[in-house]
Amino acid sequence: MSLHIIILAAGQGTRMKSELPKVMHCVAGKPLVQHVIDTARRLEPENITVVYGHKGDVVQAGVSGPGLLWAHQAEQLGTGHAVAQGLQNLSDDGQALILYGDVPLTSAATLKNFLAVSQGKLGVLTVTLDNPTGYGRIVRNDAGSVISIVEQKDATEAQKAINEINTGIMAVPVSRLKEWLPKLSNSNAQGEYYLTDIVALAVESGVDIVTAQPSFLHEVEGVNNRIQLAALERAYQQQVAEELMLAGATLRDPARVDVRGVLNVGRDVEIDVNAVFEGDVTLGDRVKIGPNCVIRNAVIANDVTIEASSIIEDARIDAFATVGPFARLRPGAHLFEKAKVGNFVEIKKADIGPGSKVNHLSYVGDATVGSNVNIGAGTITCNYDGANKFKTLIEDDVFVGSNTALVAPVTLGKGATIGAGSTVTKDVSDKQLAVARAQQRNIDGWTRPVKK
């Protein structure tokens, strides 16, 4: 039986008090609805239809991935009405899985189990709460079979005492869905077409109704306000932190590490507090990440140390290199084995060769630095003339003195030495000493100006 997934993402989310559609608010740096789409793809459905409404152009522009189908819900008339908008993409012999764009953390494992028990039946994902107030109740008969779902505003006092609630996630044979949706009525307290009313129609039709529950409560928790958004962020980060620790990483405080993408760790990795990882990041064995670091789309090899408050983006760092504290590696930076980038150093689109050092207060951009090079404090590669970028080539075993400006394009040959305070505008050959600075003058009898 083919699988069709419908994701409901049309709501405005007025309680968010935001110009942004609710489903475009983020957990772990990713829009809520993108989490749902990514999970849906792991189920390998025939198609995924996203039902959009409020600011649909923002939703369509803000999610990624090929092959999404879109259905417009011009008026928000309830969940049953929303699902009906996506029916044109569903084949009658398939099964429809209904998901919600503001319920981001449902796992693929939970959904696979749910689909397995729902084949050919009406499946309802439920959960049991100590305080079910506000949710639709699962009403069962004396035999324990589900006979209806009653929304909070329509429930009797006896029904309000039921603590098994509907999560909203359903699996339905498409042919039955097309049969039941036109029969829905909006004669209820909300004046809406409830998708949950198909349960009573299933009972009338003699269709079996089955239920399943998720492994964790946060898998079915939705977002209606920013407090709930923050709670799901913490739940997600706690889950990721536990996975990292089980994979061999030590987190100094699991509550103070944020992963906003995919983080792969080797053995005996150490991550200090307030580290943020974004995009795709790989940490090799025995990598040490200091406090307050931001690492985005980086590959960091074994035995690398990243000191406190360093920022690394789209960079590669080879084994035994060290970075920071307070260093910045921008896109295109590559530190080779045992290279060192120290405090208040910025590297952009540059290779720093094996064993080379840029220890303090320097900028190296659009450059290739060979092996065993020492770049003194305050060195700048002047790579931009206001219109174009130019490259600096520093070959092996070069020594660059402090407070030096290297005006690109320029090449420093192997073993060259640059005197401190130089502004180098011409190539320096192998093993040459270059000194390019004004001659010092000492003036006797100098009197400092005084304030008038």
Curated annotation (Swiss-Prot):
Its main location: cytoplasm. UDP-N-acetyl-alpha-D-glucosamine binds at residues 8-11, 22, 73, 78-79, 100-102, 136, 151, 166, 224, 330, 348, 363, 374. InterPro entries: Bifunctional_GlmU, GlmU-like, GlmU_C_LbH, Hexapep, Hexapep_transf_CS, MobA-like_NTP_Trfase, Nucleotide-diphossugar_trans, Trimer_LpxA-like_sf. Residues 227-247 are annotated as: Linker. Its cofactor is Mg(2+). It holds the Pfam family NTP_transf_3. The keyword Zinc-finger does not apply. Mg(2+) binds at residues 102, 224. It is found in: Cytoplasm. Pathway: Nucleotide-sugar biosynthesis; UDP-N-acetyl-alpha-D-glucosamine biosynthesis; N-acetyl-alpha-D-glucosamine 1-phosphate from alpha-D-glucosamine 6-phosphate (route II): step 2/2; Nucleotide-sugar biosynthesis; UDP-N-acetyl-alpha-D-glucosamine biosynthesis; UDP-N-acetyl-alpha-D-glucosamine from N-acetyl-alpha-D-glucosamine 1-phosphate: step 1/1; Bacterial outer membrane biogenesis; LPS lipid A biosynthesis. Binds 1 Mg(2+) ion per subunit. Catalyzes the last two sequential reactions in the de novo biosynthetic pathway for UDP-N-acetylglucosamine (UDP-GlcNAc). The C-terminal domain catalyzes the transfer of acetyl group from acetyl coenzyme A to glucosamine-1-phosphate (GlcN-1-P) to produce N-acetylglucosamine-1-phosphate (GlcNAc-1-P), which is converted into UDP-GlcNAc by the transfer of uridine 5-monophosphate (from uridine 5-triphosphate), a reaction catalyzed by the N-terminal domain. In the N-terminal section; belongs to the N-acetylglucosamine-1-phosphate uridyltransferase family. This is Bifunctional protein GlmU. It comes from Hahella chejuensis (strain KCTC 2396).
